């Protein structure tokens, strides 16, 4: 009877606790912070935002990242709400538009100023109308309004603030009123749909990066009052073709038109005093560049990767031009060769210095360096993809080469050094030191067979890029040996240089190091690699390289086509074995493969790889990196792999795996699809160990889903217990220093499917 009497009170108590906990949880998620001056500076919580009576100011980033649908101001003497937006009490200041506002928005005619970030992150707004009463907009007004297409600005607006429309990726056009005198930095940065811009003549100042990354901007008109094109103003406007009204510009700052790859013409003013560093870098379609008489300074790389011809006014005291090339005033330094000039580039006589990037990226078929030039560096020819030959003068004393300078120019097949040069000579199109000891410059487009001179001692990585079919050297050479068209060290133990056009390769008996092949693998053409039966360090099977006993797969050939199944004798795979396997389409990892927990299988640039299947076996953890595997569509994992670490998976990949492992999470991370192959048992609960005389008793809670349990260490199985009802077993004292693991298993398709293990330390 007493139980029935107090039951309603008990239920009321439980309900009160539940409501209290729920309220506490909600309160824990909400933040409402007001400082001692009355500024609301931090908020998170309900999308309906109450502006309490103690709030007299709103911080500029108070609602950053917060979803808001409307503001309420009941009882507040400083603010009011109109249609859910927040205003000052007198209605002259628009403070905040709710971030979830959709469609169009019209600012009331009472508003004179729009506050900092007022519309920032209103990602659903499509159009805004600003009345003529507004004269001031603060920074970041419309930043990141991704769907905003149209904005009508006030005719009395005096300036456009910093980042005002930055990230408005749908904004197609905008009319800037003639009342505007300045536009601040990044005002239209990353407006990727903006197609044209016309600056009224009232504008005298436009800040840096104002239109940078407007990748669809095709046409721009500058204001007549502008005297400078600011830093990075049109940087990366890749579709920009014309810039109008430039005749009054006195300064073009650095990066101003960088990467405007379709910019065809630019009118250079008589008033133009300076052109900044990289101002026209990579303006690939820029035609004739005319340097007027008043231009005093041209910065580093100003026209690198640009122009088809340079013309310098004859009265310019600082620069000159000859044969379409830009030179210093005395004609001694080549500042820039026009990259769009095709055919033979014959650098004028009198030039004794060549700027570091004067030639890079040029379309020339040959380059002749004039007498008088004494110093050059190999990377000065970087990107000259049409280049077939280079002619060096007898005056050349120094040719600088740093590690990594090797050029991969597929057409370059001839280097010629003028007779009489005391420092270098050329033979069969290759440049050597005068004593023949060093390869100085090997033309990477050279094809066929090549024989290294007997005197040569060092090649470094100068032959890293080649298109040779074979490389040989005299048997009398003290420094190198050659077998089967491959160059080795004098003892034949390691590869020094490999002919990149070679389709197959046999590793000789003496070779014990193939690291060179790994370094150049991305450029190899080999479909298969065999190994001499006398080699003690390597073996091969089906054209794939293993260690001598076939336990470790070391190297999969770049051009080996189709699917591949790892032999069952293989226990390990080198982390980079499948890097740059360009023709591999599918891979099966067999049951005996095991791997250190902290090792990763790399499949970088396996461009045709579509699927990988891992068989049930030794692996319980797998780490893979799929950089450049854009066609990968399917991964299949067994129940034994509990944890996966999958990096750079392409979006949309399908993973076939087991529930209660991490396969599903991996698929979700890649925005892909998870296909369940079943569910592994849950972790055993209640596991505990106690000592009983000379042995230990392990106990656990029974699991109804289990078909049995396995008790084991890292080295061996202790017990294999059948039946879900088993809840304990004894462990011999010899395992007293070991970590003990227990896991449940169930039978599916006549095979054991193990769950995750629970570990316990006996000691």
Regions found by a protein language model. Give the residues of each.
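Sec-dependent N-terminal signal peptides of Gram-positive bacterial secreted proteins and lipoproteins
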Residues: 6-25
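Structural signature of tandem-repeat unit edges
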Residues: 25-35, 44-57, 66-85, 89-113, ...
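Consensus positions within tandem repeat domains that build extended binding/scaffold surfaces
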Residues: 60-62, 95, 115-118, 138-141, ...
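Pro/Thr/Ser/Gly-rich low-complexity, intrinsically disordered linker/stalk tracts
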Residues: 679-705, 749-763
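Short beta-strand elements bearing conserved aromatic residues within extracellular beta-rich modules
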Residues: 709-711
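Short beta-strand segments within Ig-like beta-sandwich modules, predominantly Fibronectin type-III
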Residues: 718-725
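Short strand-edge motifs at loop-to-beta-strand transitions and within beta-strands
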Residues: 727-729
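Beta-strand-rich modules
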Residues: 731-752
């Amino acid at each position: 009877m007493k139980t029935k009497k107090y039951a309603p009170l008990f239920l009321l108590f439980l309900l009160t606790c539940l409501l209290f906990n729920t309220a506490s949880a909600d309160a824990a998620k909400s933040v409402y912070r007001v400082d001692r001056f009355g500024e609301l500076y931090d908020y998170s919580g309900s999308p309906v935002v109450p502006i309490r009576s103690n709030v007299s100011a709103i911080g500029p980033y108070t609602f950053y990242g917060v979803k808001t649908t409307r503001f309420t101001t009941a009882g507040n003497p400083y603010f009011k709400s109109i249609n859910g937006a927040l205003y000052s009490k007198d209605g002259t200041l628009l403070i905040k538009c709710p971030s979830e506002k959709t469609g169009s928005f019209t600012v009331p005619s009472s508003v004179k100023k729009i506050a900092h970030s007022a519309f920032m992150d209103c990602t659903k707004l499509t159009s805004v109308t600003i009345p003529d009463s507004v004269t001031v907009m603060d920074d970041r007004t419309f930043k990141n309004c991704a769907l905003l297409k149209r904005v009508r600005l006030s005719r009395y607006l005096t300036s456009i603030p910093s980042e005002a429309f930055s990230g408005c990726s749908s904004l197609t056009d905008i009319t800037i009123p003639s009342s505007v005198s300045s536009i601040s930095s990044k005002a239209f940065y990353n407006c990727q749909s903006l197609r044209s811009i016309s600056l009224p003549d009232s504008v005298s100042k436009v800040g840096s990066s104002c239109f940078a990354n407007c990748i669809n901007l095709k046409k721009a008109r500058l204001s007549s009052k502008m005297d400078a094109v600011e830093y990075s103003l049109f940087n990366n406007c890749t579709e920009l073709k014309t810039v109008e009204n430039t005749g009054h510009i006195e300064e073009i700052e650095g990066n101003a038109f960088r990467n405007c790859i379709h910019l065809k013409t630019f009118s250079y003013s008589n008033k133009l005093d300076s052109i900044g560093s990289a101002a026209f870098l990579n303006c690939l379609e820029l035609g004739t560049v005319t340097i007027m008489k008043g231009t005093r300074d041209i910065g580093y790389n100003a026209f690198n990767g640009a122009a088809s011809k340079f013309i310098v006014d004859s009265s310019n005291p600082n620069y000159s031009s000859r044969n379409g090339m830009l030179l210093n005033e005395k004609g001694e330094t080549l500042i820039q060769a026009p990259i769009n000039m095709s055919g033979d580039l014959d650098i004028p006589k009198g030039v004794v210095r060549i700027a570091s990037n004067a030639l890079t990226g040029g379309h020339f078929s040959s380059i002749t360096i004039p007498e008088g030039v004494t110093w050059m560096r190999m990377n000065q020819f970087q990107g000259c993809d049409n280049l077939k030959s280079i002619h060096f003068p007898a005056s050349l004393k120094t040719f600088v080469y740093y590690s990594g300078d090797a050029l991969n120019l597929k057409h370059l097949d001839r280097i010629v050094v003028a007779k009489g040069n005391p420092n270098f000579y050329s033979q069969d199109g290759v440049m050597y030191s005068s004593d023949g000891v060093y390869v100085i410059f090997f033309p990477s487009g050279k094809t066929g067979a090549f024989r290294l001179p007997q005197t040569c001692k060092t090649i470094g990585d100068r032959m890293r890029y080649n298109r040779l079919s074979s490389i040989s050297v005299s048997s009398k050479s003290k420094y190198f040996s050659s077998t089967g068209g491959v160059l080795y060290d004098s003892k034949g133990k390691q590869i020094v240089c490999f002919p990149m056009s070679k389709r197959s390769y046999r590793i000789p008996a003496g070779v014990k190091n193939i690291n060179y092949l790994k370094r150049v693998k991305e450029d190899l053409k080999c479909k298969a690699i065999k190994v001499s039966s006398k080699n003690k360090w390597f073996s091969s099977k089906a054209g794939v390289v293993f260690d001598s006993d076939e336990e470790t797969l070391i190297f999969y050939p770049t051009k080996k086509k189709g699917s591949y199944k790892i032999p069952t004798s293989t226990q390990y795979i080198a982390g980079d074995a499948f890097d740059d396997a360009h023709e591999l389409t599918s891979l099966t990892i067999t049951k005996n493969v095991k791997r250190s927990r902290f090792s990763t299988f790399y499949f970088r640039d396996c461009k045709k790889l579509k699927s990988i299947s891992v068989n049930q076996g030794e692996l319980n953890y797998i780490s893979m990196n799929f950089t450049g595997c854009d066609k990968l569509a399917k991964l299949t994992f067994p129940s034994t792999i509990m944890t996966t670490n999958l990096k750079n998976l392409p979006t949309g990949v399908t993973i076939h795996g087991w529930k209660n492992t991490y396969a599903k999470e991996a698929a979700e991370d890649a925005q892909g699809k998870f296909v369940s192959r079943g569910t592994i048992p849950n972790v055993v609960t209640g596991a505990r160990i106690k000592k009983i005389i000379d042995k230990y008793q392990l106990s656990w809670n029974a699991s109804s889903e289990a078909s049995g349990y396995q008790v084991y260490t890292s080295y061996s199985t202790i017990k294999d217990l059948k039946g879900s009802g088993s809840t304990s077993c004894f462990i011999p004292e010899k395992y007293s220093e070991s970590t003990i693991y227990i896991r449940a298993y169930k039978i599916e398709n006549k095979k054991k499917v193990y769950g995750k293990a629970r570990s316990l330390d006996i000691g």
